[in-house]
Amino acid sequence: MYKRQVYERNKPGDTFGWGVVFSDQTMENLIANDPVSAQKMNDELIHWDYIDTIVNGEVDRSGGHGFIGIGRKRLLQILYDRARELGVELNFESEVNTENLPAQFPDADVIVAADGLNSRVRNNDLEHFKCDIDMRPNRFVWLGTKQTFDDAFTFIWEKTEHGWLWVHAYQFDKDTSTFIVECDAQTYENFGFDSMSHEESAETCRKVFEQYLGGHELLTNSAHIRGSAWINFPRVLCHNWIKDNVVLIGDAAHTAHFSIGSGTKLALEDAISLADKLDTVADKKQALLDYQNEREIDALRLQSSARNSLTWFEQLDRYLKFDFKQFSYSLLTRSQRVSHENLRLRDQKWLEGMEKWFAENATGKKFDKPIAPMFVPYKLRAMELVNRMVVSPMSMYSAENGLPDDWHFVHYGALAKGGAALVYTEMTDVSADARITPGCTGLWNDEQQHAWARIVGFAHKHTNAKMAIQLGHAGPKGSTKKPWDSKMSDEPLDEGGWEIVSASAVPFADYSDTPKEISRDEMQSVLEDFVSATKRADAAGFDMVK
């Protein structure tokens, strides 16, 4: 039987923040690992289904999101009680010398560093843990309120004379909610939050969001020894979680932005995995390696979504200019974990309303039923596209002397009949010396122009597709083999090549031919080639030139 000891620098119940948000999947993991503590949590969980988006008093609600929450202090108490039942020794208000843990605990088989986003264990040896810490620019503060927001996770934006403030609010017990206030660096400075006490900050925020608080105050937990004043979010990513018999878990190893509510989830699932490996793998060193290998991918996946979310909040100036409906849609899909069709599963009525709004807003026409945004027509200057699908340029390297032939006729004809509204050609070169390979298409003579006109004419006669041509010049990448004739990318031709030019005499790759530094007269010649090719593209009937 192992002796298990926990050393906590804080008093029992001291915690950073107010409530914790879980997903149903996290609870399933907890139930499978320890049904006793999971049941106690489950008995006290607050459930909600909606997300409310509020901007300057305007409200948009969507459903089907399925959140659950619990108070951090209550969660800790449940875990304390269960740990004691299982014989774990809990030591509170116990500072540990993190500079040499193995010397301080010489008999320990494993030392678990769960000391959070400001982990001293990690910070003492950032190089060993291969740790990147990226301090993000926005500021936020953890507050609480007796206003319950009892049926929705609520996002609120208010524009003030000092800039935008916004809130992430959610209920975590029967009469209390977390109330996180966030802003950008300039708004933080404009308000003077840096010179305010925690209580003064809370009162300032209360006045801004008074209409949503139902007469309740904003609460602080300033008795906590670390405080919870305005801070920047540190994005922590460790590529190594192990040093000797010391192992990182939770925020010490990786952080996920609070806007997707997954920090505690990651920590709990780390702990479950670590306990399982220590229990089932005889060699402790291998157990730690297996733990990191199992958890690292999941953590990276969630961190990627969290990065998308935090970046969205950092770029709000862009999104707050959107129509309110579009803003709400952007908010819901910001992490890229929730797709358009996933929103349909969550709240079909809401999404269909959004689709109908989008189609009418984009076209100025009324629609009896919703249309998926992909199939809404699009107008670019005088060019009208029947939908928003585009076939991007793809070099095929199948021409001779730059001439598109029957192969290209079939290829582009099939793409045009495939349903995309806009079909791009491959990069088509403006002169023979502008080609990447001998197989590249061109548009520098009449024969090529007529061949392209045949392809464009077919697309216009038999499909709704518009045709766009991509004109280009290879520069230092020119005079190279076709991809299937070489083991290397862009390998120079052995014979039959041509002189290549570039802005400077620097090879494209270390094995490439050295280009000639282009002269002013040659620049003018290249410019004239582009002008000539553009005129030929227009004469061939192309709808668009890139």
Give the predicted meaning of each segment.
Residues 457, 472-540:
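Non-globular sequence segments
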Residues 363-474, 481-483, 526, 534:
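N-terminal capping/small domains of soluble enzymes
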Residues 112-113, 143, 227-308, 312:
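Conserved mid-domain beta->alpha element of the FAD-binding
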Residues 24-142, 351-358:
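Conserved N-terminal helical subregion
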Residues 3-17:
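Glycine-rich FAD pyrophosphate-binding loop
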Residues 276-366:
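C-terminal helical "tail/cap" subdomain of flavin- and related membrane-associated enzymes
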Residues 81, 103-233:
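Conserved FAD-binding catalytic core of PHBH/FMO-like flavoproteins
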